[in-house]
């Protein structure tokens, strides 16, 4: 409590639970989907005083730059699938995870030869490069590498959410067919 009072904000913790060797082994498992539990702080103002985890700004860029491009631990299509359709199915997120008519238009346009993470533990507030466009719910959030200021995102809950009328925490067998 003294640390929280002295700091005047949230106190974060970074745990080192997996070796790089284990990360590479798990990356090769085809049923592993990718995600992040890190917050997305703005790299400006009061947020620059926080000690964010480097993956706050470079998690997915690191996946593409290190494990796809450099190590060839998985293919580009497999990485994209495991960042989109697979987690959407795992979390029962309706109308998400695919580029399909009637689905929410959440799209990231990047150059697979240039995408790169730059954040480190000593300098965590470094944005990734190689991402050109980000479209959230059909609206540009990043256009030609520049943030637009649009706030078109929304909180998304799958069927595992306790308030869901559908109930359940996994996609049905029928829903799984389209991801493989």
Regions found by a protein language model. Give the residues of each.
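His/Asp/Glu-enriched, well-ordered alpha-helical/loop segment
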Residues: 1-8, 21-114
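C-terminal cap of metal-dependent C-N hydrolases
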Residues: 24-31, 36-37, 41, 108-154
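Active-site glycine- and acidic-residue-rich loops that bind
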Residues: 12-17, 91
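Short, surface-exposed, low-complexity cationic segments
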Residues: 150-164
């Amino acid at each position: 409590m003294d640390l929280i009072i002295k700091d005047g904000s949230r106190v974060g913790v970074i745990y080192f639970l997996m070796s790089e060797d284990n990360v590479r082994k798990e990356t090769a498992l085809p049923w592993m989907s990718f995600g992040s539990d890190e917050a997305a702080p703005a790299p400006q103002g009061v947020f620059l005083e926080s000690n964010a985890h480097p993956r706050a700004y470079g998690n997915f860029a690191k996946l593409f730059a290190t494990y796809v491009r450099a190590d060839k631990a998985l293919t580009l299509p497999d990485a994209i699938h495991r960042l989109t359709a697979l987690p959407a199915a795992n979390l029962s997120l309706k109308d998400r995870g695919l580029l399909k008519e009637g689905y929410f238009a959440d799209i990231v346009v990047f150059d697979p030869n240039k995408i790169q993470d730059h954040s480190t533990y000593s300098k965590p507030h470094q944005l990734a490069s190689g991402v050109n466009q980000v479209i959230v719910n059909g609206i540009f959030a990043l256009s030609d590498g520049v943030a637009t200021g649009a706030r078109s995102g929304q909180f998304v809950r799958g069927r595992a959410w306790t308030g869901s009328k559908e109930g359940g925490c996994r996609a049905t067998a029928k829903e799984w067919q389209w991801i493989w």
